[in-house]
């Protein structure tokens, strides 16, 4: 269905490639919309239907219909496969194997953007057995997927709890006005790019990792480099700000406090050596949750958005006392450790599923 999306009408839902969750391959109901125009039954998703992305970077992404998802119409960039002679979940599970994604990588290669048409999808070899055996295997995998979905929900709820605690505590506590410049001495870093990374060498952080790898607090360094000449090293308690993005100004406000000394810092970022009058960990939480929109107003640019220290140094902040900052930081660090434990459990469950899929569908 090549229809535009409109506000959800309460009955008819519209599933597009972006509505299929990357992690769970389920329909995400965070932003429900309806298809605009005349609704055609041949685009209605039914039991035993699998939807497959046919073009773009998401080629190969799949979704298996669930009755609980309601009345769904699928968009034109999705292909529907109706599985009637085999267990749909058994077939769907094979679309999450390394074998499948290797096949997608080869089959989707185009001179332009990647894509796979319906005839090509039908050529992917599916392993089958008796319907009774397929149903048993599908039941096991379904239970594991449900557990993974529950684990994702636990992590999501813990993150929401953290945000709520930060915001509610901030609302209730007494605050004093300071400027960004009062927080400590700022510093710039050297040039360091992805090409400078190596398997071994000195621990380092490049600015892109502030978006993709690290959260509010950096306790373990993931990257290394052999480029050491003239580079700036971290001090424990430094607050690191990325200074450019192509997304939006709000997402640019994503600083991290580093709890490790002598780490090479490089790329499009700046830092602040936080004064002992402030808790660097609390400040990281504060900027990521409370002052994000406030500082985003100082960012400049359209295609590439920039933020420099000089843009924000005079910005006014309302902060709790150091005693309150220390108390709050301790609570939030403990909550982050709980999130980390749950994320490790999620990784174990995901690895278990991958192992089972590999053993069953080599």
Where in this protein do the model-derived segments appear?
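Short, ligand-facing micro-motifs at secondary-structure edges
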Residues: 2, 20-32, 50-74, 88-93, ...
């Amino acid at each position: 269905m090549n229809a535009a999306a409109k506000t959800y009408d309460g009955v008819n839902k519209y599933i597009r490639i972006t509505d299929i969750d990357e992690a769970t391959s389920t329909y995400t109901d965070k932003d429900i919309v309806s298809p605009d125009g005349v609704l055609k039954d041949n685009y209605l998703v039914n039991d035993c239907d699998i939807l497959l992305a046919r073009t773009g970077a998401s080629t190969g992404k799949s979704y298996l219909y669930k009755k609980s998802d309601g009345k769904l119409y699928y968009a034109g960039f999705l292909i529907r496969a109706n599985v009637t002679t085999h267990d749909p979940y058994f077939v769907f599970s094979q679309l999450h194997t390394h074998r499948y994604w290797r096949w997608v990588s080869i089959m989707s290669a185009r001179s332009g953007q990647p894509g796979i048409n319906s005839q090509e999808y039908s050529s992917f070899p599916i392993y089958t057995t008796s319907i009774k055996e397929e149903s048993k295997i599908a039941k096991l995998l379904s239970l594991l997927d449900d557990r993974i979905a529950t684990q994702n929900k636990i992590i999501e709820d813990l993150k929401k709890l953290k945000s709520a605690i930060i915001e509610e505590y901030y609302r209730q506590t007494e605050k004093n006005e300071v400027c960004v410049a009062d927080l400590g001495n700022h510093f710039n870093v050297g040039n360091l790019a992805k090409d400078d990374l190596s398997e071994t060498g000195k621990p380092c952080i490049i600015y892109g990792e502030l978006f993709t790898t690290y959260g509010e607090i950096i306790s373990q360094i993931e990257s290394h480099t052999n480029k050491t000449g003239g580079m700036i090293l971290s001090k424990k308690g430094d607050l690191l700000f990325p200074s450019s993005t192509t997304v939006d100004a709000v997402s640019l406000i994503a600083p991290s406090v580093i709890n490790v000394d002598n780490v090479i810092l490089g790329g499009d970022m700046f830092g602040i050596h936080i004064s002992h009058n402030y808790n660097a960990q609390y400040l990281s939480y504060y900027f990521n949750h409370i002052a994000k929109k406030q500082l985003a107003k100082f960012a400049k640019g359209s295609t590439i958005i920039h933020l420099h220290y000089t843009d924000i140094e005079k910005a006014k902040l309302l902060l709790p006392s150091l005693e309150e900052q220390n108390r709050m930081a301790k609570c939030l660090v403990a909550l982050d450790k709980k999130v980390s434990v749950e994320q490790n459990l999620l990784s174990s469950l995901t690895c278990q599923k991958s192992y089972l899929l590999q053993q069953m569908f080599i």
